[in-house]
Amino acid sequence: MDPLASSISQFALEFSKELAASAAGKNIFFSPWSISSALAMVYLGARGTTAVEMAKVLQLNRDQADKTGPESEKKRKMEFNLGKAEEIHCDFQTLISEILKPTDAHVLKTANGIYGEKTYPFHNKYLEEVKTYFGAEPQSVNFVEASDQIRKEINSWVESQTQGKILNLLPDDSVDSTTRMILVNALYFKGTWEHQFLAQNTTEKPFRINETTSKPVQMMSMKEKLHVFHIEKPQATGLQLYYERRDVSLFILLPEDLGGLEQLEKAITYEKLNEWTSADMMELYDVQLSLPKFKLEESYDLKSTLSSMGMSDAFNPSKADFSGMSLERNLYLSNIFHKVFVEINEEGTEAAAGTGSEVGFRIKYPSIEFNVDHPFLFFIRHNKTNSILFYGRFCSP
């Protein structure tokens, strides 16, 4: 796996565990790729301990750590070679270009923006590099005198960048005259399935939240040859659903037990996820699939989560070092706002004649029923780059 894609996958799992610790019984949904690339724009201007902390949280040292000896030695020897920063940003440039390559198979719209108080002007070199590597243009704005007007303008920009799907990213009172710099990050995805669900097969079914509580959902169903993988500890079954052209896939990790989600979340690691979803682990089955139809829209103020993961200096007025971004020494990151939207519904490919048909003898595959009627983990992966675009858990309709 590409070192940057592996860093993003590791960040996804660590970030998810941090969110889960304070969100028992709640849905979680975020974009590790989008958060990572947005933070990398800030990392580009970070120096000193601020940069070291960001590299650790973003797992940008991961390829170095993997090459050292035993676990204790890894930790002891782990060094964050900030001289590699240019290579890291070139990797982000390549990855972003590949993921956002125009296609008629799916819609992926992202909005990344850095807004700094105008009395802390950005270096020209920083502005040039952010545009080169990330295709973004940091904005100098008047938070001191017009914070609410700036908030509304940012919201309008995000709305236009995401085809009207991400609204009101910055809520009332989220910025004020003391705001120095904020990072906004929004992502919208809509894909069509390789094998579509038929709307007439969607029926109301119970989704079991726990042993005593159920809620009705619109349950989609199909019978199709799909890739399935089995997880032994804790016991769970996984399934891969391709979107059109197979550029992107949805993976579902369904615990065998109704109450098994917590154990699965605790057990999952970067290495295990790689193993479970490898081609060697996948087997084709004739699957009778039942999957809830759902929309998820989640908003996060990332300051507290990232601080608790170890990235605290960036938010500290007396410790932040963004001297690669501005000459003003007391520039710091006031907040990071992240919002994502996804819709899982019946829509599949607008099938051309012959789609889904087979020539020659039909191979008989083992049959399995995959009934997603209780809490599960899921993620959406860009297959060519092996990057996790979205990661989430669905606990309650």
Curated annotation (Swiss-Prot):
<dbReference type="GO" id="GO:0005615">
    <property type="term" value="C:extracellular space"/>
</dbReference>
<dbReference type="InterPro" id="IPR023795">
    <property type="entry name" value="Serpin_CS"/>
</dbReference>
<dbReference type="Pfam" id="PF00079">
    <property type="entry name" value="Serpin"/>
</dbReference>
<dbReference type="InterPro" id="IPR042178">
    <property type="entry name" value="Serpin_sf_1"/>
</dbReference>
<dbReference type="GO" id="GO:0004867">
    <property type="term" value="F:serine-type endopeptidase inhibitor activity"/>
</dbReference>
<dbReference type="InterPro" id="IPR023796">
    <property type="entry name" value="Serpin_dom"/>
</dbReference>
<dbReference type="GO" id="GO:0005737">
    <property type="term" value="C:cytoplasm"/>
</dbReference>
<dbReference type="InterPro" id="IPR000215">
    <property type="entry name" value="Serpin_fam"/>
</dbReference>
<feature type="short sequence motif" description="Nuclear localization signal">
    <location>
        <begin position="74"/>
        <end position="77"/>
    </location>
</feature>
<comment type="similarity">
    <text>Belongs to the serpin family. Ov-serpin subfamily.</text>
</comment>
<dbReference type="InterPro" id="IPR042185">
    <property type="entry name" value="Serpin_sf_2"/>
</dbReference>
<protein>
    <recommendedName>
        <fullName>Serpin B10</fullName>
    </recommendedName>
</protein>
<dbReference type="InterPro" id="IPR036186">
    <property type="entry name" value="Serpin_sf"/>
</dbReference>
<feature type="site" description="Reactive bond">
    <location>
        <begin position="362"/>
        <end position="363"/>
    </location>
</feature>
<keyword id="KW-0963">Cytoplasm</keyword>
<dbReference type="GO" id="GO:0005634">
    <property type="term" value="C:nucleus"/>
</dbReference>
<comment type="function">
    <text>Protease inhibitor that may play a role in the regulation of protease activities during hematopoiesis and apoptosis induced by TNF. May regulate protease activities in the cytoplasm and in the nucleus.</text>
</comment>
<keyword id="KW-0539">Nucleus</keyword>
<keyword id="KW-0722">Serine protease inhibitor</keyword>
<keyword id="KW-0646">Protease inhibitor</keyword>
